[in-house]
Regions:
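Short, basic/glycine-rich phosphate-binding loops at helix/coil junctions
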Residues: 137-143
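Substrate-binding strand-loop-helix patch
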Residues: 25, 186, 216-217
């Protein structure tokens, strides 16, 4: 804990260890599940992954009358009422893209989906671009810096989300936004993750690019990866989640992404 991994070490086409801030750990098995920074570790072993990150904003209201115990998404709003009566909400899946030079990676694969849903993205040129340039010039340790980015929410979403909530549920006329927070979502061009043991280098397994659905998929993916590492074969066919789909032309463009 608190020790960053900077590289996956290989020899003779096989994993032999991971390089960390505190030295090298020898191992013949590595699961790369480093979220939005997985592409950096994989790049070091010759696997090019067109992975990006977008910044989402969520909000929480004051305590309100009961609406529903279910998660609701529609009419440009997603909501979930908590047991204490407050409501978590987000505005129509709109996300911010903090532009950096890294966004050139996989651009041709992302572009069709971006253009077809461009109203859901807000392109931002801000301090993230400067930090990216400085890191590239100074040779900063990209996989572990910043260690805890704490992305800021886009508070411009709050009044829109609140107005939609009151329009959908007129009984919630006293609703107010009391908290907002931001988070990074790692994304891949087709909206589905990479869950793979590519074979080169041997001993490597990958689980990344969950596009905001990792919390729900975590238990089954963890079980399948454990099977893969233990027996060499998962109990389900995971061929659709291969990392090579982005380079061998088998990636299927999605009609929509949620």
């Amino acid at each position: 804990e608190g020790c960053g991994v900077t590289a996956i070490e290989t020899a003779g086409g096989a994993v032999v260890g991971v390089v960390t801030e505190r030295g090298t750990i020898r191992t013949r098995r590595v699961i790369c599940a480093a979220g939005a920074t997985s592409f950096r570790l994989l790049d070091g072993v010759g696997i090019r992954l067109p992975q990006q990150a977008v910044r989402g904003t969520c909000m929480r209201t004051n305590v309100l009358p009961d609406v529903s115990a279910s998660t609701i998404w529609g009419h440009g709003l997603g909501i979930r009422q908590r047991r204490n009566g407050t409501i978590n909400l987000a505005d129509d899946m709109q996300v911010d893209v903090d532009l950096t030079l890294g966004h050139l990676r996989g651009l041709s694969l992302f572009w069709p989906q971006f253009w077809s849903q461009r109203e859901k993205f807000r392109l931002r040129l801000n301090a993230a671009a400067l930090r990216d340039v400085c890191a590239r010039i100074g040779g900063a340790a990209g996989p572990i810096e910043p260690r805890d980015p704490q992305p800021q929410p886009n508070r411009a979403h709050a009044p829109r989300a609140l107005a939609k909530l009151k329009a959908i549920f007129p009984a919630l006329k006293d609703a107010q936004i009391v908290e907002a927070w931001g988070g990074l979502i790692d994304v891949l061009p087709d909206g589905i993750p990479v869950i793979d043991a590519p074979g080169t280098p041997s001993g490597l397994a990958i689980a990344t690019g969950f596009c905001g659905h990792g919390f729900a998929m975590g238990p089954i993916v963890g079980r399948l990866l454990a099977e893969w590492v233990d027996t060499g074969e998962p109990s389900l066919d995971l061929s659709a989640f291969r990392a090579r789909r982005f380079v061998d032309g088998t990636m299927v463009r999605p009609r929509s992404m949620l």
